[in-house]
């Protein structure tokens, strides 16, 4: 058996110096203890090294595994069939990867490609990075095209195109085109187009287009579209904003045109500026500065500065009006109020129907407090307090209650039932009971006793008298 001499390494040794090598187990020279050979130190180093110089200047590549470092100062340290084509590019491992961008990096994976300077792909499959100083973390079939300083964290089939300083964190089939300084967190099929400083948190099939500083937090098939900025959809499904400075909190199938808010609910619509729908379903605002708090199928049509609190199928058709609630109430007059009830109709300006059912007023500055089928027609300053089927057709008149009364004289009043008036300045009563009247002998005694002209007193014989 051959033994090696224990000696220190001589100084000044170079790769061209010859050395004596004994390979134990090699009996080709007839010696059972091994064979001896002469070689330079460089020849021995090349024989045992895993790496070799690539075709690029000062480049390095792993030997014998179809790796190519073509760029100057490039490195391919492992994997199979990888190519570093540009200067200072690096591929650590994987298979079929190509680093053709200056100072670009591929960590591993399969069939990944970097094209622009400073681009990075950490791993994954079939990813393409064509953005300067951009990053793809992994996943498969994620593409960055002409999007500088941007990132795709992972997921699959995500696309960043012409969107500088933007991020898609992950998810599937998310797309950002012309969306500088924007963000998609994840989800599926979300899209941002021609909108800067915008945000989609997640969800599915959400879209932002042509509107800057827009936000969709999540949900399904929500859409922000139109020119402008500062619109937000927090969640829900099939919600749409078509203008700027607007908000939808959630719900489904809600629509905001511009500068308005829908908090939630379903199938609610605002077609104007500065309006609000709190919730409910099927509510619609057509004119500006109006509010519907909730309910169903309530509508403000040609009505600015109007309010519907709730109820169902209530409608306001003129400005500065309010319906508190109820069902099928309609206000046509400016500055009018319906508190609630059923099928009340108000055509007069600055008039009020507090409640009841089927009450109507076409008079201005008039009031129907309640009851049923009561009507104030084409007059002003009149009042029906309640009752059933009462009608006023004159000014400055009133019906306290009762039923089937008809008042057609000015400054007249009805207290009772089935009364028809026939003169002005008169109060009409079916029956009148007066109790605890003072008793006096005559008119002089009544005046002396403190009564005033027009007061009523009783004589000792039971007669009623009026002081004169």
Question: Predicted segment positions?
Answer:
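Glycine-centered loop/turn motifs
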Residues: 11-12, 16, 425, 454
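A general structural signal for short secondary-structure junctions and capping/turn motifs
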Residues: 9-12, 417-420, 456
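Solvent-exposed aromatic/hydrophobic patches embedded in short alpha-helical segments
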Residues: 19-22, 414
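Acidic glycine-/aspartate-rich tracts in secreted/extracellular proteins
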Residues: 23-28, 189, 419, 461-462
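Periodic small-residue-enriched repeat registers in elongated scaffold domains
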Residues: 49-437
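Short, surface-exposed beta-strand/loop "edge" segments at domain boundaries and coil↔beta transitions
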Residues: 24-33, 436
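Glycine-rich, low-complexity segments
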Residues: 1-5, 34-75, 425-453, 459-468
């Amino acid at each position: 058996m051959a033994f090696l001499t224990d000696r220190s390494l001589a100084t000044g040794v170079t790769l061209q110096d010859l050395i004596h090598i004994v390979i134990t187990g090699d009996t080709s020279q007839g010696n059972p203890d091994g064979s001896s050979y002469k070689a330079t130190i460089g020849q021995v180093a090349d024989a045992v090294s895993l790496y070799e110089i690539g075709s690029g200047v000062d480049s390095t590549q792993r030997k014998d595994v179809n790796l190519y470092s073509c760029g100057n100062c490039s490195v391919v340290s492992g994997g199979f069939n990888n190519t570093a084509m540009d200067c200072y590019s690096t591929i650590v491992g994987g298979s079929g990867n190509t680093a053709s961008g200056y100072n670009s990096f591929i960590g591993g994976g399969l069939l990944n490609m970097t094209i622009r300077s400073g681009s990075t792909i950490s791993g994954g499959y079939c990813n393409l990075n064509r953005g300067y100083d951009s990053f793809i973390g992994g996943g498969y079939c994620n593409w960055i095209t002409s999007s500088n300083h941007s990132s795709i964290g992972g997921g699959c089939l995500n696309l960043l195109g012409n969107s500088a300083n933007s991020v898609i964190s992950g998810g599937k089939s998310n797309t950002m085109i012309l969306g500088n300084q924007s963000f998609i967190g994840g989800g599926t099929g979300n899209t941002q187009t021609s909108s800067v400083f915008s945000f989609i948190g997640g969800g599915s099939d959400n879209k932002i287009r042509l509107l800057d500083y827009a936000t969709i937090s999540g949900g399904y098939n929500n859409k922000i579209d139109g020119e402008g900025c500062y619109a937000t959809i927090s969640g829900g499904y099939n919600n749409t904003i078509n203008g700027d400075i607007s908000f939808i909190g959630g719900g489904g199938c809600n629509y905001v045109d511009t500068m308005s808010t829908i908090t939630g609910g379903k199938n609610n619509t605002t077609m104007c500026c500065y309006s609000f729908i709190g919730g409910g379903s099927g509510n619609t605002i057509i004119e500006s500065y109006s509010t519907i708090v909730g309910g169903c199928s309530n509508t403000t049509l040609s009505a600015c500065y109007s309010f519907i609190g709730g109820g169902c199928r209530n409608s306001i058709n003129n400005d500065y009006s309010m319906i508190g609630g109820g069902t099928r109430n309609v206000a046509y007059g400016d500055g009018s109020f319906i508190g609630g009830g059923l099928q009340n109709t108000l055509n007069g300006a600055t008039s009020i129907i507090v409640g009841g059912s089927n009450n109507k007023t076409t008079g201005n500055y008039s009031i129907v407090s309640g009851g049923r089928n009561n009507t104030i027609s084409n007059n002003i300053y009149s009042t029906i307090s309640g009752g059933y089927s009462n009608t006023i057709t004159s000014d400055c008149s009133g019906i306290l209650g009762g039923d089937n009364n008809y008042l057609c004289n000015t400054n007249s009043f009805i207290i009772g039932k089935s009364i028809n008036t026939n003169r002005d300045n008169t109060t009409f009563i079916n029956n009148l009971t007066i109790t605890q009247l003072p008793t006096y002998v005559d008119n002089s005694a009544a005046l002396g006793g403190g009564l005033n002209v027009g007061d009523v007193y009783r004589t000792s014989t039971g007669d009623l008298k009026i002081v004169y």
